[in-house]
Amino acid sequence: IDEGRWKMAAPKFPANAHRHDPYRNFKFQILIDGKPVAGLTRVSALHKITEVVEYREGGDPSSSRKLPGRTEYRPITLEQGVSHDPVFEKWANLVNNLDGDAAMSLKNFRKNIVLNLLNLQGSVVKSYMIHRCWVSEYSALPDLDANESVVAIEKIVIQNEGWERDEAVSEPTES
């Protein structure tokens, strides 16, 4: 075997050589206006898709080239157990409320939010800044059913204009 061809992959967790398992998906936090949102039960995936633009040159009619086109950032759903925390309702009402268009907040309805992924010790391991978000859907209560015994969930769907990982957040040393 030619040793020069086989190189070791970079460690997945450079600050924690003992660690082999990836992070879990059940410890996370969302910050809206710099404050953590209590009781979140679910955040949908951060997902972007770039359309493909096909391009053919006249001198090469047998194949086409594929170029990146417009990138779309998919909506993000946030869910929390119903409580007396008004953060979802107040944000949704900045876009639309019973007082009509005049009550819409043209200044404050868009917010930059932060999504933090936490390790099992509760330390931030990855952080994403989500830009220019606004609420496009709001569910104050779920379907109510006397034959079920489940937690009532409040939900918002937010539109966004892009997200990026906060490179300043690095892997914390675990104990």
Region locations from a protein language model:
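Glycine-rich, low-complexity intrinsically disordered segments
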Residues: 4-175
